[in-house]
């Protein structure tokens, strides 16, 4: 029976790299995969997943109105899909998470999601909360703080390098805007503004 997986971490842990490698492993064996990413995440171009180390792939996009189950079911009816991959899973809606669960349960296709657990304020993303609750398997991807401890938190910085403590939960940005910290250094950074 297929499973729904949630691979989570903070920024710059290699989530997209791992997704692209796993998808390649299927494709190398002649199996078809589908990769999805958020439509508004255009850091690598719309409909593209890219890693910091230079790997990239085209991807289908999702937005609030996308029915992931219907889309995957239709594509699977045309040609078998061996695995579904979702990058930036923290940008899914809660109903998307249940659609992904249905892909695993009803279509018997493994679904591998990759995303952030918490935002810059230390709060769970709604989709991450749902994935933590219902995913069959949870996998933490580790990265490190500047002190060498495991990084579990992320801080957002403005264009002047000052820590941001308020604002929209979702704001697309990369290496210069977000920095990963252990909890101790996140608290010190977050409280210093």
From Swiss-Prot:
GO terms for molecular function: ATP binding; thymidine kinase activity; zinc ion binding. Disulfide bonds: none annotated. The keyword DNA-binding does not apply. GO terms for biological process: DNA biosynthetic process; thymidine metabolic process. ATP binds at residues 9-16, 87-90. The active site is at 88 (proton acceptor). Keywords: ATP-binding, Cytoplasm, DNA synthesis, Kinase, Metal-binding, Nucleotide-binding, Transferase, Zinc. It is an enzyme of class 2 (transferase). PANTHER family: THYMIDINE KINASE (PTHR11441), THYMIDINE KINASE, CYTOSOLIC (PTHR11441:SF0). This is Thymidine kinase. It comes from Agrobacterium fabrum (strain C58 / ATCC 33970). The lineage of its organism: Bacteria, Pseudomonadati, Pseudomonadota, Alphaproteobacteria, Hyphomicrobiales. The gene is tdk.
